[in-house]
């Protein structure tokens, strides 16, 4: 189980005066970002460390609890590569981008929306957050055009339909978007 922020503070053996100082220093930022939407891009390589993952999720819930409206947008490169290996599919990269045929696109979708997204939503819930996971293809959330024919299904974003995200935020959810 994860250590809560309160337990971390207790383990630090800091005085109440020091705690008050920390909160006082944070107050201008809390006021500045209260009721503001922030987008956090959480990349696949940052997800490798379980400890870092837990800290990021806890921090997002803290932001949400103090009135900031986070939107978590995540990838999952390393887990995608692992799954492709498991099914015997070789990853090929051109200029740092994965060549993505139809079969690879289906595996990517399965890993991002079916596995990683659900794990992150669950972790946010364990820390007291209220999160909903969606995929970039849900409700035409993200529209794209093919970036380079050599890359297959890899695209460049042409439009983001933000309304589904705004609807979730209005209902006090933390949107978790797989891309």
Segment roles from a protein language model:
Residues 1-179:
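Nucleotide/pyrophosphate-binding catalytic subdomain
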């Amino acid at each position: 189980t994860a250590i809560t922020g309160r337990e971390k503070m207790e383990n630090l053996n800091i005085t109440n005066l020091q705690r008050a100082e920390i909160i006082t220093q944070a107050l201008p930022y809390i006021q500045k970002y209260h009721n503001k939407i922030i987008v956090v891009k959480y990349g696949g390589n940052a997800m490798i460390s379980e400890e870092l993952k837990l800290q990021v999720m806890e921090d997002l819930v803290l932001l949400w609890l103090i009135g900031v409206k986070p939107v978590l947008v995540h990838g999952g490169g390393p887990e995608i590569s692992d799954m492709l290996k498991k099914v015997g599919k070789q990853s090929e990269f051109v200029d740092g981008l994965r060549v993505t045929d139809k079969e690879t696109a289906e595996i990517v979708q399965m890993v991002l929306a079916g596995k990683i997204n659900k794990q992150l939503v669950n972790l946010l819930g364990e820390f007291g957050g209220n999160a909903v996971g969606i995929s970039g293809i849900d409700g035409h959330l993200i529209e794209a055009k093919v970036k380079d024919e050599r890359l297959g299904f890899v695209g460049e974003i042409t439009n983001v339909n933000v309304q589904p995200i705004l609807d979730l935020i209005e209902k006090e959810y933390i949107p978790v978007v797989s891309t």
